């Protein structure tokens, strides 16, 4: 993700690669092993709004106790935190986000939560996708985006998953999609993707969705879960906009989208 961001940093904003680090803990592991040059490059891309980082170390079940929540919000050194410009707390796939977490986000001056409930294991108390203000007992509040789970983004441009499997052998016996396998940018494929998108958006409108925008999370189609970035996505977005399709597409971090 860092290399893709660096490669496109001098492009116009809509043609830059963007990536949201889904959990703070693996980022901390990367940071501890990275060279000083790589750390500086990462901070440059964070400043350039091409990389954003989740305030939460993991996607966490809702039953942690007070001591555990305190530890999770003191996960990295304070001087490191101050450099990362963290704007949002994310909770995807693991359902349940308690007030204990929300108040600690506010204590860190973070006012956004991005969620994607797994519909196989629960349901949303509000219509998805959509936003609402979550007010705390002390009158502080956060803006919550209750979005689709991360595998849904691809399905706004394709009839079905390219591959959806989570198997122990995935790392060694399958490969991530290569150029030409997925999100093809020839005219026929682009028009097909446009037709799928228009149908999905029409369905949303008929169900009452009235926002003038839609934000989607987008995962790779290698293992779907915990995947790396998909380089083909940026070329697809660029071609889409060049063809004049509406709505226009933008690749943004979660913080920028909020």
Model segments located where?
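Catalytic-domain carbohydrate-binding cleft regions of carbohydrate-active enzymes
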Residues: 1-258
């Amino acid at each position: 993700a860092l290399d893709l961001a660096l490669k496109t940093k001098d492009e116009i904003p809509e043609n830059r690669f963007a990536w949201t680090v889904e959990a703070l803990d693996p980022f901390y592991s990367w940071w501890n092993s990275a060279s000083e040059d790589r750390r500086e490059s990462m901070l440059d891309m964070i400043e350039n709004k091409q990389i954003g980082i989740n305030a939460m170390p993991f996607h966490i079940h809702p039953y942690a106790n007070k001591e555990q929540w305190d530890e999770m919000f003191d996960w990295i050194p304070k001087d490191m935190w101050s450099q990362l410009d963290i704007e949002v707390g994310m909770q995807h796939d693991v359902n349940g986000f308690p007030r204990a977490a929300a108040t600690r986000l506010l204590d860190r001056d973070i006012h956004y939560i991005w969620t994607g409930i797994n519909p196989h294991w629960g349901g949303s108390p509000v219509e998805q996708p959509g936003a609402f203000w979550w007010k705390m007992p002390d009158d502080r509040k956060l803006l919550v985006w209750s979005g689709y789970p991360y595998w849904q983004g691809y399905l706004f441009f394709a009839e079905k998953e390219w591959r959806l499997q989570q198997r122990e052998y995935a790392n060694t016996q399958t490969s991530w999609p290569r150029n030409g396998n997925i999100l093809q940018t020839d005219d026929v494929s682009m028009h097909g993707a446009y037709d799928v998108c228009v149908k999905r958006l029409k369905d949303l409108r008929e169900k009452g969705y009235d926002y003038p925008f839609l934000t989607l999370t987008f995962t790779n189609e290698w293992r779907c879960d915990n995947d790396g970035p998909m380089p083909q996505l940026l070329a697809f977005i660029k071609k889409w906009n060049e063809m004049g399709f509406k709505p226009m597409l933008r690749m943004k971090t979660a913080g920028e989208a909020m």
